[in-house]
Amino acid sequence: MIIDNKTTTIRDDFNNDFKVEYNLIKTNVDDNIIYGFSVNTTNMSDNTNLYKEFLDFTKDLEYAKEIFEKLMENLVLPLNLVNVLDEIIN
């Protein structure tokens, strides 16, 4: 279930505009609540989509919210979601 969502538009080095949607996700796994993230981009010129999710991240909602804000601040794209999460949490 999506519990928070933010959307922005970014432009790459080739002047392509991308709509980027960030989701904070709550999942029940074996009666445990786990929080994770998904990032979805849509290329505005050709409507191609790229989607990546990382669901099994933390049980701590406040920590998940903090990381969610950092994803948005750093304009993280689906291709580098896992790598950026590794950098943020280390």
Segments predicted by a language model, with ranges:
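Negatively charged, low-complexity tracts enriched in Asp/Glu with abundant Ser/Thr
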Residues: M1-N23
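Generic marker of residues within folded, mature protein domains
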Residues: D12-F14, T27, F54
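A positively charged, amphipathic N-terminal helix/segment that binds anionic biomolecules
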Residues: F18-V29, V82
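A short, structured beta-strand/loop element
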Residues: V29-K52
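Mixed-charge, Lys/Arg-enriched low-complexity segments
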Residues: S45-N90
